[in-house]
């Protein structure tokens, strides 16, 4: 008791000491090491997002073959997005019909569950194979990748897609067109299976209701690797005898497996599984048992896996890396086998330690795998555990659960490193660096927050595109694109190097943080990735929210007034580890009551007069301070006045008289000046001018015209037919002037007349043309100019494609003289010539890319073309020399059989024709596959012993006798032979069945409708599985429950255009109510 009191006192003292010394606690806090965290606000400018109205659960992401588009599957929707900016290319709504929803509601499911959740999204060539839960009635479609609305086939999603959106599943599509799916095959999810369908191989599945094959699995991923298809999942450990625990598994099947014959029909004969170990080593290892996600690096044959603790355990996660060789080694080792339910699990030697899916070439089991069918029934679980590359997990973290993983291989300055992106269950992505040589430990480089503060939700999917270094994240309400190289995020050299980011380094020349590809020279590129980055714990202080306004008091001299006050604290956050204190006031005061006070008086204003009695003014205001919020106003006057200049007499008053009238304008038109005057009374010194001027009569003067009289007629030195010409002159002048005397004679006018020499007609101006009269204005010796003849056309400036030529003439025939008129018109003329285009020689364009091979097998060809269009030959130019098409052979390997066997010939029709048919067994025929007709006809072939009725009527007596030669003796002989042959066949079948009566209780069976009663004395010692291991059950139910359209082992492509509702067998009807 005393010791307890001492301990309590110590803890109490320690608490009091911490309260009294907070600086010591802060110092400890600032010395801790944390990884950098990029907030949603910081990463926001780098993100690209896509959202769609009413679309949620963006859980399926894949890329088109050209890696230019992102295909997204959400609830009730399919989307095609641009990889660059996630802009929408196409959106297709894929919703359940009302009848399907009502059927789902009737089975007790909620509205949220009865939707179409996309769970399979696979790209095969130019097609998109996708499946959805379709309100617990799964359905699959085969669409065009370039147009999602174009549906080529629609088939049932049973065994290809889960019924419930809560069930985990995985699927892959091989190059041969086979679909491998791992999912639940029934409505309640009690029949899990790894199932193969489509393609040319028969459908197969794991044994039904056999916990040694699959025991409540959660499927994670699947990969097509070499001869095998690998599946990764977690399940309840059937080999664990003490309680219930979950183990992680790697399973594989051969891709050429066609099932068994008599045993394991429609069932895998090559299915094997092994446990995956991911644990923290120690005297008592700490196991991470539950596999959550995987990522396969085919270049290095490495598989990264995320493992967590059980859901009811402490949260912890780890990343373990497995080599394919280690997985293959486990499958080559011994099996773990339990003889019966009371026996222990013991190792059993592997009959085929180096099994590589070889097949039997001849005999009864031709084309079956080399594995013995009885061994395939018994030996499922491998004894050895698959160990990771390193004994310690590559990365571990407590108090956290990872859900998805993606891996990128990055070339650093000195070495290759692996970058692991881990999605957490609370909506962040952790970026971890793992060295390849394992000489140093892994580092958590940063954690990216995809949601604002205080908002958390799990990540639905994670896909990485190595060619563009981007990460795509599927969330509930949107898709996010995150660039992996964000070197511009680091502004200084210290932050760039200190980030320890393998993608980034400091370029000494450009003086900025760049990626290795952006750097000008590796020698000038600095990078350090030898340590782990630490988070800067310095926190600058920021104020919190203001408190509500509260009443408070203040003292104003001797008076006390009331105010409203509010405060805020520097605690959002408080400054830590050397951070800045908050800037700004921590308290605000408002609405304080205040009494008014007078300001001091202003100075007296100048006197209102310079002489004689005037007055002066001074003022003050009630603003020192202004009364506010109920304060007292000022008492007294705010203005005072007084007289001034009482004794200063003014001198006599001098003033101007009024202005006199305007004097006469100096001009009658065209603008003049006029003046007016005034007189200064009582003195000579009045301010201002005594004369004022202004413009007047600004209107324009009228136009005046003055013409001189004609001069006498005078003869001109021009004669005509014995007569002569005479001329006379006068001058005319026009102007706008106020005085007509200012006009002067200007322009000369000439007038001519003709006088006959005989004096009979006198002189007259009649008959003189205007041109002659005009010419008469000049001297008699005036010579007008005239053009010479045109010269020949000059040579064309171009040989083709439109040139120019010209010709000239000169004004010298005669030249104008003595004031004669010059030549009229141009002296130079231009004309187009050689207007035909120039010939153009053709030139080949660049070769087009090679086309796809015309056939996937059996010998096809691909080709490329070019055209004589760079430029094309024209106007007589030479054509291109050479071939415009090149072809080459491709895919010369022989094709697998794509047609089913021909059916039997039909009965002879009335038209005398028999018909038989065949079907294409490929869902995706390519090239020459399934070429030819699906039906074939021929004329009827009659039996030689059959004679038509028409022939009987016309037959001879000899023919009748020939038909009657088959008598009773022949019938007895045939009957005895048939009886003996039947007995022999019955004996052979009985002997064969006795041979297999001792087969293992691991035979694949389904639940019988009415199982045989068991011995009650040992019922308590036999597990549920042993109830269905009897020989009788094997005889009655030696086949698996396959999909109806696949019971014949082959997929019927002609049924894919229909929509199938799920069909349950009789033995499954009792589960429909769950």
From Swiss-Prot:
Organism: Homo sapiens
Positions of the Sema domain: 35-484
SMART domains in alphabetical order: PSI, Sema, TSP1
Cellular location(s): Membrane
Cysteines engaged in disulfide bonds, as pairs: 104-114, 131-140, 254-357, 278-320, 487-504, 496-513, 607-644, 611-650, 622-634, 665-696, 669-701, 680-686, 796-833, 800-838, 811-823, 853-890, 857-895, 868-880
Residue intervals on the Extracellular side: 23-968
Protein's UniProt name: Semaphorin-5A
One Pfam family named in its UniProt record: TSP_1
Functional description taken from the UniProt entry: Bifunctional axonal guidance cue regulated by sulfated proteoglycans; attractive effects result from interactions with heparan sulfate proteoglycans (HSPGs), while the inhibitory effects depend on interactions with chondroitin sulfate proteoglycans (CSPGs). Ligand for receptor PLXNB3. In glioma cells, SEMA5A stimulation of PLXNB3 results in the disassembly of F-actin stress fibers, disruption of focal adhesions and cellular collapse as well as inhibition of cell migration and invasion through ARHGDIA-mediated inactivation of RAC1.
One GO term of the biological process aspect: blood vessel endothelial cell proliferation involved in sprouting angiogenesis
Residues exposed to the Cytoplasmic side: 990-1074
InterPro entries: Plexin_repeat, PSI, Sema5A_sema, Semap_dom, Semap_dom_sf, Semaphorin, TSP1_rpt, TSP1_rpt_sf
Keyword Disulfide bond: yes
Subunit structure of this chain's protein: Binds PLXNB3.
């Amino acid at each position: 008791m005393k010791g307890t009191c001492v301990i309590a006192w110590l803890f109490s003292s320690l608490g009091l000491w911490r309260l009294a010394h907070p600086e010591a606690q802060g110092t400890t806090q600032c010395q801790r090491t944390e990884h950098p965290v990029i907030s949603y606000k910081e990463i926001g400018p780098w993100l690209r997002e896509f959202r769609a109205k009413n679309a949620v659960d963006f859980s399926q992401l894949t890329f088109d073959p050209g890696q230019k588009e992102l295909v997204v599957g959400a609830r009730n929707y399919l989307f095609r997005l641009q990889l660059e900016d996630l802009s929408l290319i196409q959106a297709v709504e894929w919703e359940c019909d009302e009848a399907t929803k009502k059927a789902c509601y009737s089975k007790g499911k909620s509205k949220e569950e009865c939707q179409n959740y996309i769970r399979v999204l696979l790209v095969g060539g130019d097609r998109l194979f996708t499946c959805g839960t379709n309100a617990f009635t799964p359905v699959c479609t085969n669409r065009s990748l370039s147009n999602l609305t174009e549906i080529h086939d629609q088939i049932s999603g049973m065994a290809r897609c889960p019924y419930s959106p809560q069930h985990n599943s995985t699927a892959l599509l091989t190059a041969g067109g086979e679909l491998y799916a791992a999912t639940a095959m029934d409505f309640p999810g009690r029949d899990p299976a790894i199932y193969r369908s489509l393609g040319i191989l028969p459908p197969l599945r794991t044994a039904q209701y056999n916990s040694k094959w699959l025991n409540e699995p959660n499927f994670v991923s699947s990969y097509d690797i070499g001869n095998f298809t690998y599946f990764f999942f977690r399940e309840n450990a059937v080999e664990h005898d003490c309680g219930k625990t979950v183990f992680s598994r790697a399973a594989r099947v051969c891709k050429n497996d066609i099932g068994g014959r008599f045993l394991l029909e429609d069932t895998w004969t090559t299915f094997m599984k092994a446990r995956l170990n991911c644990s923290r080593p120690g005297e008592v290892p700490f196991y991470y048992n539950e596999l959550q996600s995987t990522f396969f690096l085919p270049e290095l044959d490495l598989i990264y896996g995320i493992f967590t603790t059980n859901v009811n355990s402490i949260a912890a996660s780890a990343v373990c890396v497995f080599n394919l060789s280690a997985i293959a080694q486990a499958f080559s080792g011994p099996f773990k086998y339990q003889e019966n339910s009371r026996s222990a699990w013991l190792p059993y030697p592997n009959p085929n330690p180096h099994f590589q899916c070889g097949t039997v070439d001849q005999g009864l089991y031709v084309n079956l795998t080399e594995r013995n069918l009885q061994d395939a029934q018994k030996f499922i679980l491998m004894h050895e555990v698959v160990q990771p590359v390193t004994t310690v997990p590559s990365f571990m973290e407590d108090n956290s659960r990872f859900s998805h993983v993606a891996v990128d291989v990055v070339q650093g300055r000195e070495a290759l490193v692996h970058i692991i992106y881990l999605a957490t269950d609370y909506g962040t992505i952790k970026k971890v660096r793992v060295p390849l040589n394992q000489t140093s430990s892994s580092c958590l480089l940063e954690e990216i927050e995809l949601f604002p503060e205080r908002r958390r939700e799990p990540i639905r999917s994670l896909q990485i595109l190595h060619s563009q270094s981007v990460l795509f994240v599927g969330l509930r309400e949107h898709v996010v694109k995150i660039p992996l190289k964000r070197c511009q995020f680091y502004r200084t050299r210290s932050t760039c190097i200190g980030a320890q980011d393998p993608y980034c380094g400091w370029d000494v020349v450009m003086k900025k943080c760049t990626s290795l590809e952006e750097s000008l020279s590796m020698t000038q590129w600095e990078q350090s990735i030898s340590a782990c980055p630490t988070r800067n714990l310095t926190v600058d202080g920021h104020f919190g929210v203001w408190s509500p306004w509260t009443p408070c008091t203040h003292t104003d001299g001797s008076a006390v007034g009331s105010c409203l006050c509010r405060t805020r604290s520097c605690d959002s956050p408080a400054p830590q580890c050397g951070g800045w204190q908050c800037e700004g006031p921590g308290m605000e005061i408002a609405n304080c009551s205040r009494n008014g006070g007078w300001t001091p008086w202003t100075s007296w204003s100048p006197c209102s007069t310079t002489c004689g009695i005037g007055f002066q003014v001074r003022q003050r205001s009630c603003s020192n301070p202004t009364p506010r919020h109920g304060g007292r106003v000022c008492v007294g006057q705010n203005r005072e006045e007084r007289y001034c200049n009482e004794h200063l007499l003014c001198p006599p008053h001098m003033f101007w008289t009024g202005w006199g009238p305007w004097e006469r304008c100096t001009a009658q038109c065209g603008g003049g000046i006029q003046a007016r005057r005034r007189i200064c009374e009582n003195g000579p010194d009045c301010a201002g001018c005594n004369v004022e001027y202004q413009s007047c009569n600004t209107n324009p003067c009228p136009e005046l015209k003055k013409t001189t009289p004609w001069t006498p007629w005078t003869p001109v030195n021009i004669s005509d037919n014995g007569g002569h010409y005479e001329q006379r002159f006068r001058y005319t002048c026009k102007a706008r002037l106020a005085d007509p005397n200012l006009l002067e004679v200007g322009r000369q006018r000439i007038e001519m007349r003709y006088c006959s020499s005989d004096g009979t007609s006198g002189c007259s101006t009649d008959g003189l043309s205007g041109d002659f009269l005009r010419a008469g204005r000049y001297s008699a010796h005036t010579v007008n100019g005239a053009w010479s003849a045109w010269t020949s056309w000059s040579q064309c400036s171009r040989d083709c494609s439109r040139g120019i030529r010209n010709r000239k003439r000169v004004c010298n025939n005669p030249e104008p003289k003595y004031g004669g008129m010059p030549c009229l018109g141009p002296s130079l003329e231009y004309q187009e010539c050689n207007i035909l285009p120039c010939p153009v020689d053709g030139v080949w364009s660049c070769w087009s890319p090679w086309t796809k091979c015309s056939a996937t097998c059996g010998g096809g060809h691909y080709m490329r073309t070019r055209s004589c269009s760079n430029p094309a030959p024209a106007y007589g130019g030479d054509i291109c020399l050479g071939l415009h098409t090149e072809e080459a052979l491709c895919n010369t390997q022989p094709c697998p059989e794509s047609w089913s066997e021909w059916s039997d010939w039909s009965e002879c029709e009335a038209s005398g024709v028999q018909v038989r048919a065949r079907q294409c067994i490929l869902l995706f025929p390519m090239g020459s596959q399934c070429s030819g007709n699906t039906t074939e006809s021929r004329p009827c072939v009659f039996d030689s012993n059959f004679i038509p009725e028409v022939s009987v009527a016309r037959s001879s007596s000899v023919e009748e006798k020939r038909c009657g030669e088959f008598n009773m003796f022949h019938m007895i002989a045939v009957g005895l032979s048939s009886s003996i042959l039947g007995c022999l066949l019955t004996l052979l079948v009985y002997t064969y069945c006795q041979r297999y009566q001792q087969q293992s209780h691991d035979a694949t069976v389904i639940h019988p409708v009415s199982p045989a009663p068991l011995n009650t004395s040992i019922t308590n010692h036999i597990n549920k599985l042993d109830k269905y291991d009897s020989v009788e059950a094997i005889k009655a139910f030696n086949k698996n429950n396959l999909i109806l359209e696949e019971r014949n082992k082959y997929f019927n492509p002609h049924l894919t255009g229909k929509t199938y509702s799920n069909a349950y067998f009789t033995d499954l009807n009792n589960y429909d109510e769950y």
